[in-house]
Design a protein with these regions (language model features):
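Basic, polyanion-binding surface patches
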Residues: 2-189
Length: 189
């Protein structure tokens, strides 16, 4: 009983101290400054690199992404954010088939190729249509097959949720590829 009273007394004291702590109001930040600060913060944040591909009416489309995130294991869902000016985004609709190619360090050249807006990303790149019709790049890393579940406009970008229905495990032991400070970096697995 004494322990309970001591514990409760400690909690009450801590609660009183927390009530007295105040947070200063930061100076307002302009939208432009906030956007620059956010870009600077994420420039120093290492992010895995992938290529998202889909088949559009005019042929295969794809781009390099560093915004890939796992959302849910059951059901298997990942997300990616695409700039609203992206030609790949323009071809996507809900239910579109897509493939997410998770890149190993030895494919930084492919990441560079698919990062150029408006370029013919598939010229000189080995690929074939998957069983579902999306462009599958020839590579060794994990490959996630799925379809667009939802698309949410967030301002200058669109957040895309992709339901994964098939995975090629690939080589999970090769060094990984991350993007940080506008450069590719190899990391051991």
């Amino acid at each position: 009983m004494i322990l309970e009273g001591s514990f409760l007394a400690t909690i009450v004291k801590m609660s009183d101290k927390l009530k007295r702590v105040t947070t200063p109001n930061p100076a307002p930040t302009s939208a432009h400054d906030l956007a620059n600060d956010l870009a600077t913060a994420f420039r120093g944040y290492p992010a895995g690199v992938a290529i998202l591909t889909t088949m559009g009416a005019a042929g295969p489309e794809g781009l390099t992404v560093s915004s890939l995130a796992s959302v849910s294991a059951v059901p298997a869902v990942v997300s990616v954010s695409l700039g609203n000016g992206s030609t790949t985004l323009a071809t996507l609709t809900e239910e579109s088939r897509v493939i997410v190619h998770m890149l190993d360090a030895d494919r930084a050249d492919l990441a560079d190729d698919f990062a150029v807006p408006g370029a013919d990303h598939f010229a000189g790149t080995e690929w074939a249509p998957s069983a579902e019709g999306a462009p599958r790049l020839e590579m060794q890393g994990p490959i996630l097959h799925g379809f667009v579940q939802s698309m949410t406009d967030t301002g200058s970008a669109t957040l895309i949720a992709v339901t994964i229905d098939r995975i090629e495990a690939g080589n999970c032991h090769a060094p990984g590829l991350v993007r940080m400070a506008r450069e590719w970096h190899e990391i051991p697995r």
